[in-house]
């Protein structure tokens, strides 16, 4: 027997875990090795990179013929290569790497539903999701699971996509022209619909002879909707041996108990290929797992594919935009942790100021989730701008009452100290979050704002030095994802009068601000990583 697990000494490995399974009535000749990734976000050359991942798969195949490579979502969005090719370049690279199973995360839908459905047949591994439903037909949009045979044994992978996709991608992508939802992810406030739908697919896979079943889920743990977390799915289902997870950008391997008290392994690898997960089913039927942080080289053929795809856009992305005299932070320089989703920061101030200058409005609200990378000191290129603002969101200005603004700030602060993509960076106003006050924001089953049921966490809201008037009408600028499409559940602006609609994209607004308002130089006005004090937390 060959044991791949014993052959990994040349790999740098961070953690390891073994989960004993019941002794099986059969024995494999070779290990089954499952390599898994999540939340790559177009990081084709980041960290291990796709070429390193391909080498890991090649090395695994040299030790055992039983190898699968699976992805848990959010692969095709998050950087210029994905934006400019609307996902196709990343799919092409994934095909070259040799994936066997993929699921859509929330950001696979960011180029629109029509575009995602165009990409589905191009993904050679296939896209799978047991809970992605068409409400018009009452059927799954995609296959729910895939059976793979290794020797004479079967392993099933069941896809699961977070219902948070309805609010963390653009909500209108899941609606018809009248604003009625035509797609669902089996969402409700209890989680029962999701558990039932996944259990249905798990049972079907077992009925087809699956010896092991793994959910490959874009679900997450910390900072995600509790009833849709991977841990709660494990606790409310049976017949699952492990959950390969994504969405929350965490790195972990842990064991929880299922509905009947049996162990279920959970694993997630972080983001941008900082690690690759490796799950091994041994000939004795045990599960062993590690997180790998380096590969033994790069696969040359995949490197060529990456270079070919990137060369298409290289001249455009190399165009200079301006210069930053200081690094403009969205991360904490002391820890490296992202703060744009739960704290004031320099880049949040900068983006909000840019929108305010270009859109000429009273107030700007910018969701922290729309800001994806820092701006480094030095010459700035178009690539740098798109790395920070890869969504292509169109800027919008509307009329909103002070009450609507207050509700948006409250919803953005509801998860603090945990991150929230809807956390508001601002211009034209300042506010304080009283973290001693529990959030009383109420949401509907899709995660949309309903009301504030009790005391408010957000206090001392000032507009140009004066207290916010809840009855006054303000011109509010930002991206259409929040203001027009109710992204991150910000439905309080629905029906508001539009003053400017799709005037300019977020990236173009940033470039206009740099070139026409800052004389092509970002000054030390934005040197303080934690911002200029617009957001206070107590």
Predicted regions and their residues:
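Bacterial N-terminal signal peptides that target proteins for export
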Residues: 2-12
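Catalytic centers of hydrolytic enzymes
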Residues: 28-31, 37, 43, 62, ...
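Gram-negative bacterial Sec-dependent N-terminal signal peptides
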Residues: 12-18
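Acidic, metal/ion-coordinating pockets
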Residues: 26-298, 342-354, 364, 414-416, ...
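C-terminal segment of classical bacterial N-terminal signal peptides
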Residues: 18-26
């Amino acid at each position: 027997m060959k044991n791949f697990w014993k052959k990994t000494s040349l790999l740098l490995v961070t953690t390891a875990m073994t989960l004993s399974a019941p002794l099986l009535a059969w024995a494999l000749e070779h290990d089954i090795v499952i390599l898994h990734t999540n939340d790559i976000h177009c990081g084709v050359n980041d960290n291990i990179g796709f070429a390193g991942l391909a080498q890991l798969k090649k090395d695994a195949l040299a030790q055992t013929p039983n190898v699968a490579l699976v992805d848990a979502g959010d692969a095709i969005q998050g950087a210029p290569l994905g934006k400019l090719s609307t996902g196709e370049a990343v799919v092409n690279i994934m095909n070259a790497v040799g994936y066997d199973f993929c699921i859509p995360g929330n950001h696979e839908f960011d180029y629109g539903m029509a575009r995602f459905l165009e990409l589905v047949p191009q993904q050679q591994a296939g896209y799978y999701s047991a809970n992605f439903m068409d409400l018009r037909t009452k059927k799954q949009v995609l296959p729910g699971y895939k059976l793979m045979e290794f020797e004479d044994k079967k392993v099933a992978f069941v896809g699961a996509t977070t219902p948070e996709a309805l609010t963390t991608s653009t909500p209108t992508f899941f609606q018809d022209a009248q604003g009625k939802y035509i797609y669902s992810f089996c969402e409700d406030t209890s989680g029962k619909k999701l558990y039932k739908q996944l259990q249905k697919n798990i049972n079907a896979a077992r009925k087809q002879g699956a010896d092991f079943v793994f959910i490959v889920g874009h679900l997450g743990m910390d900072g995600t909707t509790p009833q849709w977390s991977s841990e709660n799915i494990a606790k409310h289902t049976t017949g699952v041996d492990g959950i390969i997870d994504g969405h929350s950008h965490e790195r972990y391997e842990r064991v929880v108990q299922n509905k009947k008290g049996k162990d279920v392994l959970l694993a997630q690898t972080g983001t941008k290929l900082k690690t690759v997960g490796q799950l091994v089913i041994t000939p004795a039927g045990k599960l062993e797992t590690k997180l790998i942080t380096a590969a033994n080289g790069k696969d040359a053929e995949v490197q060529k594919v990456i270079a070919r795809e990137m060369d298409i856009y290289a001249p455009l992305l190399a165009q200079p935009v301006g210069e930053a005299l200081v690094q403009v932070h969205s991360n904490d320089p002391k820890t490296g942790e992202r703060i744009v989703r739960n704290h004031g920061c320099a880049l949040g101030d900068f983006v909000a100021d840019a929108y305010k200058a270009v859109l000429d409005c009273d107030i700007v609200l910018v969701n922290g989730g729309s800001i994806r990378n820092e701006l480094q000191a030095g010459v700035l290129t178009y690539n740098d701008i798109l790395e920070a603002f890869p969504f292509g969101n169109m800027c919008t200005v509307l009329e909103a009452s002070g009450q609507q603004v207050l509700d948006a700030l409250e919803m953005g602060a509801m998860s603090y100290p945990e991150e929230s993509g809807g956390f508001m960076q601002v211009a034209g106003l300042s506010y304080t979050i009283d973290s001693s006050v529990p959030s009383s924001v109420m949401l509907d089953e899709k995660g949309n704002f309903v009301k504030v049921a009790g005391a408010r966490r957000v206090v001392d809201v000032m507009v140009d030095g004066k207290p916010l008037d809840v009855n006054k009408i303000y011109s509010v600028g930002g991206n259409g994802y929040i203001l027009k499409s109710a992204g991150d559940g910000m439905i309080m602006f629905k029906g508001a009068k539009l003053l400017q609609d799709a005037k300019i994209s977020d990236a173009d607004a940033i470039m206009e601000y740099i070139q026409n308002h800052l004389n092509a130089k970002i000054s030390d006005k934005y040197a303080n990583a934690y911002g200029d004090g617009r957001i206070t937390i107590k």
